[in-house]
């Protein structure tokens, strides 16, 4: 169920302050954040935000198609290593 429009987008205040500070300074350095739950807003377009995935910070370059999505959607937390190979099929 999507968030109500009357509530507006959720973004952590500490992240919003970092984004506004980088916008004023014209800084292109990645902004480190642990806030995976924050929504991407139009002010973030063109910025690189390093989102923590539990082990490291994954750099995410924000484009206009990402607006309205959460930061955590672009930083996968699980590593898929593939299913176990079938040894019978390899021998044939």
Curated annotation (Swiss-Prot):
GO terms for molecular function: rRNA binding; structural constituent of ribosome. SUPFAM superfamilies: Ribosomal protein S19. Pfam families: Ribosomal_S19. Keywords: Ribonucleoprotein, Ribosomal protein, RNA-binding, rRNA-binding. GO terms for biological process: ribosomal small subunit assembly; translation. One of its GO terms (cellular component) is small ribosomal subunit. Protein S19 forms a complex with S13 that binds strongly to the 16S ribosomal RNA. This is Small ribosomal subunit protein uS19. The gene is rpsS.
């Amino acid at each position: 169920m999507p968030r109500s429009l009357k509530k507006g987008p959720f973004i952590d205040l500490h992240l919003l302050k970092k984004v506004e500070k980088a916008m004023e300074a014209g800084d292109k350095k990645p902004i480190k954040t642990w806030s995976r739950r924050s929504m991407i807003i139009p002010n973030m377009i063109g910025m690189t935000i390093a989102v923590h995935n539990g082990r490291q910070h994954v750099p995410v370059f924000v484009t206009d198609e990402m607006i309205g999505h959460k930061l955590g959607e672009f930083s996968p937390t699980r590593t898929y290593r593939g299913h176990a190979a079938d040894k019978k099929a390899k021998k044939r």
